[in-house]
């Protein structure tokens, strides 16, 4: 059985969990927090979550996990089979991650954890986020889903990066 290692506040863990649920793949959720111990690093080389336990070993990094799930659970596709459409969805996923999620993270310390963020960092984040959403507006279809008429991995990434 697959084992998803992560914790509920991690948007990346939540992306993998939703993909597992959408694909109808049985899995065990193992509440896990990042560590830097040798034992943990043997399963997750950067000491991060999520990572996925499979019968063959461990897979780390969300993109790699999502690709694996797509390959082992073909009954419910979350990426188009057509190469052009698949590349478009992958491009949207990367745009959301790099140009929306990543800039927003620079303000997480203040937004979620009681820390403070300088005005310069907030200003840069705002500028980058506006550019990121402008990019998404030009590229995404939202008809009704991010990439068009079908729910895909781009919708999962959007949900946990924007909501």
Could you say what each language-model-derived stretch is?
Residues 91, 95-98, 135, 159-162:
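Alpha-helical scaffold segments in carbohydrate-active enzymes
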Residues 104, 146-163:
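GST superfamily/GST-like fold recognition
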């Amino acid at each position: 059985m697959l084992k998803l290692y992560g914790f509920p506040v991690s948007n990346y863990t939540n992306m993998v969990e939703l993909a597992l649920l959408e694909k109808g793949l049985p899995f065990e959720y193992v509440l896990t927090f990042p560590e830097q111990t040798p034992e943990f690093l043997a399963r997750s080389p950067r000491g991060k979550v999520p990572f996925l336990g499979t019968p063959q070993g461990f897979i780390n990094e969300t993109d790699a996990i999502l690709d694996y799930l797509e390959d082992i659970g073909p009954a419910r596709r979350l990426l188009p089979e057509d190469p052009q459409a698949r590349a478009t969805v992958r491009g949207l996923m990367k745009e959301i991650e790099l140009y929306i999620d990543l800039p927003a993270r620079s303000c997480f310390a203040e937004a979620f954890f009681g820390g403070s963020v300088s005005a310069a960092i907030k200003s840069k984040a705002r500028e980058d986020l506006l550019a990121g959403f402008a990019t998404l507006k030009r590229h995404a279809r939202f008809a009704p889903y991010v990439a068009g008429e079908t729910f895909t991995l781009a919708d999962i990434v959007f949900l946990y990066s924007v909501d």
